[in-house]
Amino acid sequence: MTANPQRGEIWLVQLDPTRGQEIQKTRPAVVISSEMFSSIPMRIIIPVATWQPKFQNRPFMILIQRTEENCLDADSAGNVLQVRSVTTERFVRCIGKVSETVVQELVIGLIICVDYRP
């Protein structure tokens, strides 16, 4: 059975093989793809790492506070510089869901990183 990750869900995703500074291993990631593309077996994700104080001044590290709904082990950060598209075959299992507010904060972080100016 193929996974069908939805926007805002946190999934464990197999990110290997990687190169250079790409974030590695199987780790949580937030799906930010529009539901408009759910029939395509690819998703846009933002990998998640455990929050560290040094992330405070890094605009590409978006705080995701641990909640019962997201089921993260600790406060974490979405690393928007590591955004990528991956096949749904890389998705292991859903572990939780973030709020729409967190999804929007991640998207805003991505907009800042690409210097988008409407």
Say what each PLM segment does.
Residues M1-P118:
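Conserved functional hotspots at enzyme active or ligand-binding sites that engage polyanionic ligands
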